[in-house]
């Protein structure tokens, strides 16, 4: 009898309704997979042209107890393990000396192995029903009707949905129905780039990595590198945003030479292998570090069911590896709430998810922010952060 009541409650909550997920990143796609497992009608609207679009960025590591739990629930954990690579860390100084190495012990190889972003997307896409993801959809307007949302896309037909889940990243432009909070810059800046065939194009630095990720710091300049990102070496350089950049970035990221000149000046007394990395790079991406603070409660009155997951909900500095993992926990909790029959309405299920998310999301943001503060102190070393 109890089973019958639970099933009826679930059907009353979800039957004859459709869900629109905005954004086809790992969090949005995982959300779609978890909903489909429960027979929910879901569509993902993604601005990329197609599944072959290359995703820029470093590898992702899914943590035990958070990101991996969502993959397990989706039935994809072993596939993730098959494609992910356990990687150690080399910590170097500005002269290119290896100060310490933290290797992955065999018993820890599944703790948080690194996976290429496109590989993770492929795992998730291959698990979804055909035509779940609708490509080349840039959302320009979200409007509530009497019973459904209307989604308006740039130069594409409009769609409707009973529930909208925003998973379209930290710079989402359609949060107004959920909160008036705005994204804030934290005061640090990141420059990222890829070098293909690094063993040929920057052999000195590639050998310094020796198959591991590499981290180096000096006087507030931080360098992170991963030599194994599907044939490319991905690296990032982080520093406090210069005062003269407060109103406008003084480096033209459309002009490679402008970026190279700036970085060579910043790294003038670093080893030639670091300069080799800069000289070899063909293009750079510059990004201010941002946070979407969870300080104010979200709106309790919304015209129709809508919520946010992933960076759209809790963008944070990338200095604790918590972003994607927190987002996958979002997907796990929200999908359970919507499908397990515990709640009498979508609004109740969403509210409970948001209450939980605010707790672990704030904690993750605080950890990331504290790491950011510590890492940009002049005397910071990666040994103290990694306990090696």
Curated annotation (Swiss-Prot):
Location (main, coarse): cytoplasm
Record protein name field: Flavin-dependent monooxygenase
UniProt cross-references to HAMAP family, sorted A to Z: TetX_monooxygenase (MF_00845)
Organism: Bacteroides fragilis
Domain observations: Consists of an N-terminal FAD-binding domain with a Rossman fold and a C-terminal substrate-binding domain.
Note: Activity is not seen in B.fragilis, an anaerobic bacterium. Activity is seen when expressed in aerobically growing E.coli.
Protein location: Cytoplasm
Function: An FAD-requiring monooxygenase active on some tetracycline antibiotic derivatives, which leads to their inactivation. Hydroxylates carbon 11a of tetracycline and some analogs. Confers resistance to tetracycline via an oxidoreductase activity; NADPH is more active than NAD. Expression in E.coli leads to breakdown of tetracycline. Confers resistance to doxycycline, chlortetracycline, oxytetracycline and minocycline.
Catalytic activity of the protein: a tetracycline + NADPH + O2 + H(+) = an 11a-hydroxytetracycline + NADP(+) + H2O; tetracycline + NADPH + O2 + H(+) = 11a-hydroxytetracycline + NADP(+) + H2O; oxytetracycline + NADPH + O2 + H(+) = 11a-hydroxy-oxytetracycline + NADP(+) + H2O
Binding-site residues for NADPH, renumbered to this chain: 54
Disulfide bridge positions per record: none
InterPro entries tied to this protein: FAD-bd (IPR002938), FAD/NAD-bd_sf (IPR036188), TetX_monooxygenase (IPR043683)
NCBIfam families membership: tet_monoox_X (NF033111)
């Amino acid at each position: 009898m109890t089973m019958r009541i639970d099933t009826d409650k679930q059907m009353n909550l979800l039957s004859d309704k459709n869900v629109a997920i905005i954004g086809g990143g790992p969090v949005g796609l995982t959300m779609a997979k978890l909903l489909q497992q429960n027979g929910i009608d879901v569509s993902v609207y993604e601005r990329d042209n197609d599944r072959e679009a290359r995703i820029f960025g470093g590898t992702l590591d899914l943590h035990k107890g958070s990101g991996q739990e969502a993959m397990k629930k989706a039935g994809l954990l072993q596939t993730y393990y098959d494609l992910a690579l356990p990687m150690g860390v080399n910590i170097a100084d500005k002269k290119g000396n290896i100060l310490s190495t933290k290797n992955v012990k065999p018993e820890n190889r599944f703790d948080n192995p690194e996976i290429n972003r496109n590989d993770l997307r492929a795992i998730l896409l291959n698990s979804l029903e055909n035509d779940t993801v609708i490509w080349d959809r840039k959302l320009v307007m979200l409007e509530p009707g009497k019973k459904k949302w209307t989604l308006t896309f740039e130069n594409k037909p409009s769609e409707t949905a009973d529930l909208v889940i925003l998973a379209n990243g930290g710079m989402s432009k359609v949060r107004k129905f959920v909160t008036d909070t705005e994204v804030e810059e934290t005061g640090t800046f990141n420059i990222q780039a890829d070098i293909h065939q690094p063993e040929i194009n920057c052999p000195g630095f590639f050998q310094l990595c020796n198959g591991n990720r590499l981290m180096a710091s000096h006087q507030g300049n931080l360098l992170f590198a991963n030599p194994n990102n599907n044939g490319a070496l991905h690296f990032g350089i982080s520093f406090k945003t210069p005062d003269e950049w407060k109103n406008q970035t003084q480096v033209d990221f459309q002009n490679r030479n402008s970026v190279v000149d700036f970085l060579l000046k910043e790294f003038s007394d670093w080893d030639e292998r670091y300069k080799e990395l800069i000289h070899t790079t063909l293009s750079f991406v510059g990004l201010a570090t941002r946070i979407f603070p969870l300080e104010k409660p979200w709106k309790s009155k919304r015209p129709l069911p809508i919520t946010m997951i992933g960076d759209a909900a809790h963008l944070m500095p990338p200095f604790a590896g918590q972003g994607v993992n927190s987002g996958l926990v979002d997907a796990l909790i929200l999908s359970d709430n919507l499908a397990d029959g515990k709640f009498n309405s979508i609004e109740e299920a969403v509210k409970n998810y948001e209450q939980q998310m605010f707790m672990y999301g704030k904690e993750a943001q605080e950890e990331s922010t504290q790491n950011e503060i510590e890492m940009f102190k002049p005397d910071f070393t990666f040994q103290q952060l990694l306990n090696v």
